[in-house]
Amino acid sequence: MTTDQHQEILRTEGLSKFFPGVKALDNVDFSLRRGEIMALLGENGAGKSTLIKALTGVYHADRGTIWLEGQAISPKNTAHAQQLGIGTVYQEVNLLPNMSVADNLFIGREPKRFGLLRRKEMEKRATELMASYGFSLDVREPLNRFSVAMQQIVAICRAIDLSAKVLILDEPTASLDTQEVELLFDLMRQLRDRGVSLIFVTHFLDQVYQVSDRITVLRNGSFVGCRETCELPQIELVKMMLGRELDTHALQRAGRTLLSDKPVAAFKNYGKKGTIAPFDLEVRPGEIVGLAGLLGSGRTETAEVIFGIKPADSGTALIKGKPQNLRSPHQASVLGIGFCPEDRKTDGIIAAASVRENIILALQARRGWLRPISRKEQQEIAERFIRQLGIRTPSTEQPIEFLSGGNQQKVLLSRWLLTRPQFLILDEPTRGIDVGAHAEIIRLIETLCADGLALLVISSELEELVGYADRVIIMRDRKQVAEIPLAELSVPAIMNAIAA
């Protein structure tokens, strides 16, 4: 924290935002000091995103006041918030990937003379701006030639150069590896030391303790508390977030007896040139096979080839003992395969559609649109899964975009469970959801396994994989490089295999 550590720069008083049947923010008081990194934490549905959107003009609060440097403000939109001095950088960088770094840094405010772009001057200023934070790169190169971490750094530098006094970083490390995270943290510390105030939204608690000065916790739309990071034990932080003790029972797995030795799905030398090297994989009823590896190792590509999103061009696939050609997701679904993708918002949910409509989607697609599911049956199905999976929603007709990440994930699980699959692929099932929902999702995974479902689970949460997987396959450079049996399964064993 800077020498102005006690000088408040941003404050909300009684901030409230309501949606039909939901108090997204309820009388929230929030305070941010000049030159500090504030972690903003809470379960999904706690109100973090709503608070950010209220601060940046995406939403207009129904009640309460926002104060910036002692002045009451009411941002009309994100551009107005930026003019006032509040900038935001999201996990998915909101820049123009095909344009140069310099173009992205100065888009909308390019140096011109007589109406003509002064490109050399812009590139010089862009180089100087990046160098001022210790980054040396060719600003003439397209942004998409750089890593996700560097793209985020460019977005941050742009926001700061636009005179941001407060910078909100929303899940900036979700797609970064360890080295990239440290690169980002170095920049965050530089900004803090220069007097910029940062709000850091994340689900990674270890990172909170690495980089933040204070922690604010929200729960169910309400302010729970704000504490100095160095004075808050992690177990107490979890209690603040959950309002209860963390249920660790779901993270502990007893031994499991497989229901059958015959694989539900078996793949031999199965692969797709340019996507994933040929691999062997068998999954049996009641078995959980984990898939581990670094980002870009080929985990998601493996799932996409199996599910027919990127059809294989080599090898054989046996589903319930019969050779099959998995050429499309529809064909895979008909054969009893389900797939919950990593990116819920892009590849999973239909944001504006209701919970009911999202749940019945896969079953309706399998039946065909000439055999519609009646509205009464849809309602009964949705109510049954809301009850069975504990989906928190005011009604079956609530647009799914207003549900928390954990509840969206449960809706996606419901969608595929409704089709009664025999083989289900889960890609990062607990990513982007809170610590409490983690345990709930893992409990669901265990229940599905006990019911005889064959599961392939892709996860970066190694402790979780060790907790529930029967064996773990290791991916590296889009190849299957190792398999760790249950007797040898541990976090160090997985990490050593990944790094070998």
UniProtKB/Swiss-Prot annotation:
GO terms for molecular function: ABC-type D-galactofuranose transporter; ATP binding; ATP hydrolysis activity. SMART domains: AAA. It is a peripheral membrane protein. GO terms for cellular component: plasma membrane. It comes from the Bacteria. Its EC number is 7.5.2.9. Part of the ABC transporter complex YtfQRT-YjfF involved in galactofuranose transport. Responsible for energy coupling to the transport system. Belongs to the ABC transporter superfamily. This is Galactofuranose transporter ATP-binding protein YtfR. The lineage of its organism: Bacteria, Pseudomonadati, Pseudomonadota, Gammaproteobacteria, Enterobacterales.
